[in-house]
A protein has these predicted regions:
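Surface loop/turn motifs at the tips and blade-to-blade linkers of beta-strand repeat domains
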Residues: 32-37, 78-85, 133-138, 212-214, ...
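Predominantly a core beta-strand signature of beta-propeller blades
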Residues: 28-32, 68, 73-79, 118, ...
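Asp-box/WD-like beta-propeller blade repeats and closely related beta-sheet repeat scaffolds
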Residues: 40, 45, 57-96, 104-107, ...
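Hydrophobic beta-strand segments that make up the repeating blades of beta-propeller
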Residues: 1, 8-11, 50-53, 101-103, ...
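Blade-loop segments of beta-propeller domains
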Residues: 14, 18-50
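A detector of repeated loop/turn-to-beta-strand junctions in beta-rich toroidal repeat architectures
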Residues: 16, 56, 72, 115-118, ...
Length: 314
């Protein structure tokens, strides 16, 4: 999800290959389809009146989109230097405080030896087309945001499946310096060398996660809370959408979690919104979160096909 300057909420639907605009009309909300037939349009970002959509093979731009919701313009290709892949081939992306576009490129496998262009987060200068790698060893990130005070990049990452997956957590990570390596495929969770792919590497060579989120919770979208609607103690907290496990007998995730920080240290990690699962049955999967101008928190759910709004009763 991404927010337009006029309050339009843009939503990418990866499986449907569509991008939607949700418009608040006061007494009702209207949904318009502004693009279809796209390849995995998971990444959505808005800047200077334009909507940017990340497909598997390219990033496209829809200019002046909020004035043209009834007839979206023909998109312009702004970046296409992306590797071909069919595994983890969605491109989460967002504009950073420096004005550059950051794009996550997952590993082309559950776990494998990697070519240099995979398992990373890139910083792209759209004016020149040049990019630099700001984080390596990132298996499958589908959510990141910048700390509102330090401007450091924080991101979620999904750990490997199968094998000893119960020992491999999803992670919350912080990029303290460009080019840091976060372990994949050699080390998981900061302290578990991969039995097959560690290649004699020590976990001490890599950046350990700031927080282990739990195995197979499918930690996806995340945002720092910068609104003023929630009580003051929520400002600067992190909200993380956990879509939930898919290959475990004992299911995990299916919640939006709250992370309370003191500096860069986690003080609390606790459920914020639950109720998508009961007794091993689930009826929803939270995917992304978005802080609205009024301070409310939106939560997208790709199983129920819904967007929920969390606010505070006055």
């Amino acid at each position: 999800m991404a927010l337009g300057s006029r309050g339009t909420v843009f939503v990418g639907s990866r499986v449907a290959g569509k991008v939607y605009a949700v418009i608040d009309r006061g007494d009702r909300r209207e949904v318009k389809t502004i693009a279809s037939g796209l390849q995995q349009p998971n990444g959505i970002a808005f800047r200077d009146g334009a909507l940017y959509v990340g497909e598997t093979h390219r990033v496209i731009r829809f200019d002046q989109i909020e004035s043209r919701l009834d007839a979206a313009p023909v998109p312009v290709v702004v970046y296409s230097d992306l590797p071909a892949q069919t595994h983890h081939h969605w491109r989460y992306m967002a504009f950073g405080p420096d004005g550059a576009l950051y794009i996550a490129i997952g590993a082309p496998c559950n776990i494998c030896t990697l070519a240099a262009e995979y398992a990373q987060i890139r910083r792209v200068d759209l004016a020149t087309g040049r990019h630099e790698v700001v984080a390596r060893g990132v298996r499958n990130s589908i959510g990141f945001d910048w700390h509102p005070l330090t401007r450091e990049l924080w991101f979620t990452d999904n750990g490997r499946d199968w094998g000893e997956a119960d020992r491999v957590p999803d992670e919350l990570n912080r990029v303290a310096a460009p080019g840091q390596h976060f372990g994949f495929p050699y080390c998981h969770g900061g302290d578990f060398p991969d039995p097959e792919f560690s290649a004699g590497r020590s976990c001490a060579e890599f950046v350990a996660p700031t927080l282990k989120l739990g195995p197979n919770v499918a930690a996806l979208g995340m945002r720092f809370y910068t609104g003023s609607l929630f009580p003051a103690e929520y400002r600067g907290n992190l909200f993380i959408a956990q879509r939930g496990s898919w290959n475990r007998e004992l299911k995990t995730g299916f919640a939006v979690m709250r992370v309370t920080l003191k500096g860069n240290v986690v003080e609390r990690y606790e459920p914020f919104v639950t109720g998508w699962m009961n007794e091993e049955r689930f009826w929803g999967r939270p995917v992304d979160v978005l802080v609205m101008p009024d301070g409310a928190l939106l939560i997208s759910d790709d199983h129920a096909g819904a967007i929920f709004r969390v606010s505070v009763a006055r």
